[in-house]
From Swiss-Prot:
The keyword Ligase does not apply. Disruption phenotype: No visible phenotype. Keywords: Glycosyltransferase, Transferase. It catalyses: D-glucose 6-phosphate + UDP-alpha-D-glucose = alpha,alpha-trehalose 6-phosphate + UDP + H(+). Catalyzes the production of trehalose from glucose-6-phosphate and UDP-alpha-D-glucose in a 2 step process. This is Alpha,alpha-trehalose-phosphate synthase [UDP-forming] 2. CDD domains: GT20_TPS. The gene is tps-2. Residues 196-233 are annotated as: Disordered. In the N-terminal section; belongs to the glycosyltransferase 20 family. In the C-terminal section; belongs to the gob-1 trehalose phosphatase family. The keyword Glycosyltransferase applies.
Length: 1229
């Protein structure tokens, strides 16, 4: 492509070469550019005048030419870039064509983004464009609409883009500085920190704070790699609450000063108790003060900037235009006011400014951070699609969906605004969060935030609670499919989702089953939790009926002023001389069509028509708090209700009581004290919404007035909760239920039965409701939702009955342990559900052990009578150690490594003193070598104590961390070489160390795993018919083990394993559960099988160890048995390892490891250091003699793997200390 292009090609404009003011060229000009380029490429096309049609028809052809990598490829790439330039210049009106364009790239998106990144960055930096932000939002919208993960592909292609968007480096600097301050505060000085800390990041931070240098720990792959044996964190878990509305109300006085008050809405009442527990908790919300471009424009600054550019910059701030980048601070700082005249006035002004008021609020409460978006976007997102489409649709009231959304163009435009606002909330949430935090998103305004957050950082735990019903009509997924499917898919991207009622969750699951046929749905009957896995994401769904903070209402009940208000109100409503059997009905709600106010009034009118005897007696006091009058559907509905209320008062009059009015209709709300007084004054509460998430009014009424009756519709979530709890049944009806609010006759019957209910019966029913609500308050609701134990990520208590149950449970713990190891190594704090999982697994196994023992019994199959007896002492011990490890790793102590390693003392088979001496000897050997070029080690018996069976021998998390840190700090090339298979219950299945720390050699070194893209095998195995001999032996032995007397050998130890080049049949375990006679009988039968399939003994060789029988296939070259020495040679050949260089550490525990040691001694007799885990004197002597034959005395012996792990940990600490000291010396110099 380096040759000079033909003259005709020079006429094709360079993509992304226009200045900001020239970006919006005409479609006609772009058409001519594309036509010319297509002609040069000789691509056939229809010369249409519609640019979208042309792009849609030629994008795939351009991609094909570009992928060919021929002389025309560069020109085709230029065409693709011109199309991208157009799409990013028309983000909103051109998104449909952008989706087609991205789809046409197929599997080439990553390489395409790499090609185009330079063009985009150069344009933004040199010409003032904002194409980078346009691309980020366009891909976000694409992912939302299609369910793909194209945004993550962009991050993979250009990693720095995500960092700059989220301010990752700034956040890391802040966290390091906080970490450093805490260390300095504890130890008092720089010097003491150096002397006691095992974390060199502290010293590096000191240097970098002073010099501003960049450290290697800020690398993309491992941004938080700890500098010590174990990672620590000084930040505790916070709750980050994210909602559209804030928990406060803001008011600006005429003086310009701001006043902030605690809000009183339902969301605040629900969440405030949780948020107030910790001042570090954070609430993100929109304060109603957003960016208005029209108000912010200044002469010559932004008039030429296209309105189609997105609303966030690369730091996630809502700043479209570079020339008004400071607008966010203008919004909060109130700089439109006159400058203060003196310092005192300046200080007072600062304190009463919005920024000052918020700062003062944050000092005494949890932190409140504003989310600022474009005002036009917000108006469309909130007043348009949220309340004009989502609200009525999710309440199953399609007749109230705004008619403008019948226009697909308007629907898409408003949907873009909804996505943009969710995008901004998601960016702000990620930027303000830490990995250990729980981010709690609320309600239908922000249903896409979880999906967008996961694309930015998949390590975050993000929950969502829907406060309204989820009952969308069928047309939501046909007529409004753009919105419907994105909402359905978006909820599945949260870690956990809470619904108000079982009805809503059931509806959601039915829709997922119908529209996402491949989704896997699992129900846990004990926990009443669904887990749904779709497109690689898993979400847990629970039901959590929201409640109230009882004390917020009860504190008013007995106050003298409340009693007076109650009496005055009852007298005002019922009159001076009310009828003895007259009833005070009370209803209070927002003036919303979902509340069923119109239907209530119609039923109340019918009530007096059918029961004229109630005229002059009963009064309904209806409070309908006016809201959303600016929305046409609300205004019309409210006016019609008021007209009907006036009509009722005109129709029904009592000649004997002229002052009586059947209805008191009020549109102003009441303060809390007066509301409680109304609850106390009423006889019967009326809560009858068409559809409502929960409706807390019913609970407030009965908490305050246990003697009151209740008329409740099935549209209220609280009614479903009461029914589920048994408070309304055939035998016991504690309230008057309305099943159909649209049937005025049955509705008025409920009024009538409530009015005639005897007071003592009514009080008894009210008491039962009161007791239930008191026992299920808001604290219980929030704790239940935040409880980490109910998510799919947690191993729940389970009944372990069969071997499959046991092995499956252990594999689940492997997954948890891998996450623990990965997080600790990266410095990411550990979530609480890891400890819950391990504790649940441990307790599940303890429950099946015989009393006073660690002997577990498992059935060999679900319907089998055979019982396997396992000693699971090691498995339980490793659970206990890992739980202890989690506690230590989260401590702030600089010596948490040493503290945890000290706990391993109890594992020594002899004594504490022996443990300490062995560790000292092993550490001295490691110290003498200083550093190792190569580390070769066995696994089982060396790094891991033997378990009852191989599938249960999961590497514990603490071991994974110690081994990985040793590999990172003390050796260059680390290798685990074992006789176990590689996969299918092999060494990779039971390991918890992340890829990249160790090479894994399996089957004695005949098969190797280097990394995901690099594996190889020994090619010396006999081929053709000769290779079938081992397979024949395996088949014969499998059949043998199916016989009843040999069945126990299928589950003892490693069972029957087929390796690459040999077989292993366990005939004993470490607990000696198999008798000598049984083992001898098995050995004899296997000998017969081997002789039958290889009568001349030229192909197979039988060998026995303490625990198993091995059937080896001889090599093709000289017919000897392949051993670990051969495996090591194979590795050196394939990976070009030169063992003559540097020091080599070899660790083993049995005679099968001797060839590995010998091969190393042959190549590097002086540089080999070896530690053996054994108490066998004969084996010790063999090792000593072998080393002595090469004039090598670098030998140490330990009694158990835990001693070796302790020594490795100590060596790692020493290596870090040396490294730290060297770095400090350099800094001092």
């Amino acid at each position: 492509m380096g040759s000079e292009p033909p003259p005709s090609e020079k006429k094709v404009r360079e993509p992304f070469s226009r200045a900001m003011k020239d970006v919006q060229i005409s479609d006609e000009q772009r058409l001519k550019e594309l036509w010319h380029l297509l002609d040069l490429l000789e691509i056939e096309y229809k010369k249409t005048a519609d640019l979208h049609t042309l792009i849609s028809s030629v994008s795939e052809s351009l991609t094909m030419v570009w992928k060919r990598r021929d002389p025309k490829s560069e020109l085709a790439l230029k065409g693709l870039l011109l199309i991208l330039e157009y799409c990013l210049s028309h983000v909103f009106d051109g998104h449909a064509v952008f989706e087609i364009f991205v789809s046409s790239l197929g599997f080439n998106t990553v390489i395409f983004w790499k090609h185009c990144a330079g063009y985009i960055f150069d344009s933004d930096l040199g010409r003032g464009t904002k194409f980078r932000d346009a691309l980020l939002f366009s891909l976000t919208l694409y992912d939302v609409n299609t369910g793909k993960n194209r945004l993550r592909e962009l991050y993979a292609a250009v990693p720095g883009i995500r960092k700059s968007l989220l301010g990752v480096n700034a956040k890391q600097f802040g966290e390091r500085y906080h970490h450093l301050q805490k260390r300095l505060a504890r130890y008092g000085s720089h010097t003491s920190l150096c002397s006691v800390s095992s974390d060199s990041e502290g010293e590096e931070a000191i240097h970098n704070v002073r010099s501003g240098t960049h450290t290697e720990s800020e690398s993309e792959e491992d941004p938080k790699a700890p500098r010590s044996g174990l990672a620590t964190s000084h930040f505790q878990q916070r709750v980050i609450n994210v909602s559209n509305a804030p928990p406060v109300s803001l008011k600006r006085e005429k003086t310009g000063d701001w006043e902030i008050k605690q809000g009183s809405g339902g969301l605040v009442a629900c969440v405030d108790p949780v948020m107030s527990k910790d001042h570090e908790n954070l609430w993100l919300a929109n304060l109603g003060m957003n960016i208005n471009d029209k108000k912010q424009k200044r002469p010559g600054s932004v008039a030429s900037i296209p309105e189609s550019f997105p609303s966030t910059n690369t730091l996630g701030l809502p700043l479209i235009k570079q020339t008004i980048a400071e607008v966010f601070f203008h919004v909060l700082a109130d700089d439109d006011m006159d400058a203060p005249k003196n310092e005192k006035q300046k200080k007072a002004r600062e304190e009463m400014s919005l920024l000052g008021v918020l700062n003062n609020y944050n000092r005494g409460n949890y932190k409140l951070n504003p989310v600022v978006v474009q005002e036009d976007d917000y108006n469309v997102y909130y007043g348009g699609i949220s309340n004009g489409l989502l609200w009525p649709a999710l309440h199953n009231l399609p007749e109230y969906i705004v008619s403008e959304y019948d226009d697909e163009k308007i629907l898409r435009a408003h949907w873009c605004a909804y996505v943009r606002v969710n995008y901004q909330f998601a960016i702000d949430a990620v930027r303000n969060s830490r990995p250990q935090d729980f981010i709690w998103i609320h309600d239908y305004h922000l249903m896409l935030v979880g999906m967008i957050m996961q694309s930015l950082d998949q390590h975050l735990e993000v929950g969502f609670f829907l406060h309204i019903p989820f009952q969308p009509p069928g047309e939501f997924f046909s007529k409004y499919s753009t919105v419907g499917f994105a909402v359905l898919r978006g909820l599945l991207r949260f870690t956990k989702v809470g619904f108000q009622t079982h009805r809503d969750r059931t509806k959601y699951i039915e829709l997922v089953q119908h529209y996402f046929g491949t989704a896997k749905i699992v129900y846990d009957n004990k926990m009443d939790i669904y887990s749904i896995t779709n497109e690689g994401w898993t979400c847990s769904l629970g039901v959590f009926p929201v409640s109230i903070k009882n004390d917020d209402f009860l504190k008013f009940v007995d106050l003298p002023e409340t009693i007076k208000l109650k009496n005055d109100l009852r007298k005002r409503v019922m009159g001076d001389t009310p009828a003895p059997d007259g009833r005070f009905f009370f209803s209070v709600e927002r003036f919303d069509y979902t509340k069923g106010i119109m239907e209530k009034l119609q039923a109340y009118k019918r009530y007096f028509e059918r029961h004229p005897d109630r005229i002059g007696k009963d009064v309904l006091f209806q409070i309908a708090v006016t809201n959303r009058r600016s929305v046409d559907t609300y205004r019309v509905y409210q006016d019609e209700c008021i007209d009907l209320a006036d009509k009722i008062n005109e129709i029904f009059k009592d000649p004997n009581n002229p002052t009586w009015k059947p209805l008191v209709f009020q549109t102003d709300g009441l303060p809390r004290s007066e509301l409680v007084a109304a609850y106390l004054a009423m006889d019967i509460g009326v809560v009858t919404p068409k559809k409502d998430g929960m409706n807390l009014v019913a609970k407030e009424m009965l908490v305050c007035n246990p003697k009151a009756g209740l008329v409740l519709s099935t549209g209220a979530g609280s009614e479903i909760q009461f029914t589920t709890a048994g408070l309304y049944s055939d035998k016991e009806k504690n309230y008057h239920r309305i099943s159909n609010v649209f049937d005025p006759d049955s509705y008025c019957d409920a009024f009538y039965s409530a009015a005639l209910e005897p007071e003592d019966v009514r009080a008894e029913h009210g008491k039962r409701l009161h007791e239930f609500i008191m026992a299920n308050d808001i604290e219980r609701w929030s704790c239940a939702f935040l409880d980490p134990s109910w998510t799919h990520e947690v191993i729940r208590p389970t009944q372990v009955e069969t071997l499959d149950d046991f092995f499956s449970l252990m594999m689940k713990t492997r997954n948890v342990r891998r996450q623990i190891v990965g997080r600790v190594l990266k410095g990411i704090p550990i979530r609480s559900h890891f400890a819950i999982s391990l504790r649940n697994a441990k307790e599940s196994l303890e429950q099946i052990c015989k009393p006073g023992t660690h002997t577990a019994e498992f059935k060999s199959g679900p319907d089998s009578k055979e019982v396997a007896h396992f000693e699971i002492d090691n498995e339980l011990q490793e659970f206990e150690r890992d739980l202890s490890f989690i506690d230590y790793v989260q401590s702030d102590d600089a010596d948490n490594v040493e503290q945890f390693v000290d706990t391993l003392i109890s594992s020594h088979p002899i004594s504490v003193e022996t443990y300490k001496k062995e560790v000292e000897n092993a550490v001295e050997l490691l110290y003498s070598a200083d550093h190792f070029h190569y580390f070769f080690t066995d696994r089982d018996g060396t790094l891991k104590s033997y378990s009852c069976s191989y599938p249960s021998s999961i590497q514990p998390a603490y071991s994974g961390v110690i081994q990985a840190q040793f590999a990172r700090r003390c050796a260059q090339t680390c290798v685990i070489l074992t006789t176990a298979p590689l996969m299918h219950i092999g060494v990779l299945d039971v390991s918890t160390i992340p890829n990249g720390y160790y090479y894994f050699g399996a089957s004695g070194g005949r098969e190797w795993f280097i990394d995901n893209g690099h594996n190889f095998k020994d090619e010396s195995i006999l081929k053709g018919e000769k290779a079938d001999v081992l397979a024949s032996a395996y088949t014969r032995i499998s059949h043998l083990l199916e016989e009843p007397e040999f069945r126990p050998f299928t589950w003892v130890g490693s069972g029957l394993q087929k390796h690459y080049g040999h077989l292993t049949i366990a005939f004993q375990d470490v607990y000696k559960t198999i008798t000598e006679a049984q083992g001898k009988q098995l050995h004899e039968e296997i000998e017969k099988i081997v002789k039958d399939v290889d009568p001349h003994g030229t192909r197979l060789q039988l060998a026995s160890t303490e625990f198993d029988i091995k059937v080896y296939m001889k090599t093709e070259t000289d017919g000897h048995v392949f051993d670990k020495g051969d495996g090591l040679r194979l590795l050196c050949e394939k990976m070009h390892c030169d063992l003559t260089e540097g020091n080599v550490l070899v660790c083993g525990d049995s005679s099968t490891d001797i060839p590995m040691l010998k091969e190393c001694l042959i190549r590097n007799p002086k540089g080999v250091y070896t530690i053996w885990v054994t108490v066998n004197d004969k084996l010790k002597e063999e090792v000593r003699a072998l080393c002595a034959s090469y004039s090598n005395s670098n030998v140490a012996f330990v009694s158990c793997p835990e001693v070796l792990l302790g020594a490795m940990a100590q060596a790692t600490i020493r290596e870090i200390t040396i490294t730290r000291t060297r770095k400090m010396s350099r800094n001092i110099v």
